[in-house]
């Protein structure tokens, strides 16, 4: 419901109907919409962002790490199509409603830390040039991941996403550039 209507548009009544519960049942566990919303954000971040980072850290190369992270998002979205739209919506809502943003479980902040680590690690292993501007590259990769999340959530389907992710991977690895052109 939050991914469809946003924080302001979602009501307890609509959430209860969608969850096949009564409004009092939801109010028993969550005394406010803010508490419910923050719990959904926490669970979604754990399911997608934390698991994506955990899987990505097992890979050895930067592109493999990004691919693993994206694969977790794709799997979660194929199992529950509201996941990607909700993650995108949560980022927007945290800008509209700063009181909903909590740094310890902010998907953008957590992803940014991971990407800075991954870029630094790629430099240390000689995969990237030593003079790489880490914050700029990490932020660029964050933009790519947010774009992929937006596309997965609102525009593409699972099959399209697999092809797009493979093309993105090849693009970032330089597979499309003509040598000497």
Report residues per predicted region:
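Helix-turn-helix
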Residues: 1-35, 39
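Short coil/turn segments at alpha/beta junctions that flank glycine-rich nucleotide-binding fingerprints
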Residues: 4-8, 58-59, 80, 125
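Amphipathic alpha-helical segments used for helix-helix packing
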Residues: 64-65, 78-102
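C-terminal peripheral helix-coil segments that are non-catalytic and often amphipathic
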Residues: 68-75, 112-124, 139-144, 155-181
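Membrane-interface starts of transmembrane alpha-helices
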Residues: 80, 130, 134-138
């Amino acid at each position: 419901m939050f991914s469809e209507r946003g924080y302001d548009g979602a009501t307890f009544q609509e959430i209860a109907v969608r969850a096949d519960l009564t409004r009092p049942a939801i109010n028993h566990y969550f005394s406010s919409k803010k508490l419910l919303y923050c719990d959904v954000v926490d669970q979604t971040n754990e399911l997608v962002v934390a698991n994506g980072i955990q899987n990505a850290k097992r890979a050895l190369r930067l592109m493999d790490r990004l691919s693993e992270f994206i694969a977790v998002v794709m799997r979660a979205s194929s199992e529950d199509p509201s996941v990607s739209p909700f993650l995108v919506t949560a980022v927007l809502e945290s800008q509209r409603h700063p009181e909903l943003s909590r740094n310890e479980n902010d998907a953008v902040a957590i992803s940014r830390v991971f990407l800075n680590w991954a870029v630094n690690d790629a430099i240390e292993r000689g995969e990237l040039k030593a003079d790489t501007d880490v914050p700029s590259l990490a932020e660029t990769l964050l933009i790519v991941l947010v774009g992929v999340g937006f596309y997965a959530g609102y525009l593409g389907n699972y099959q399209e996403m697999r092809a797009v992710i493979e093309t993105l991977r090849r693009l970032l690895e330089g597979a499309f550039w003509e040598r000497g052109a």
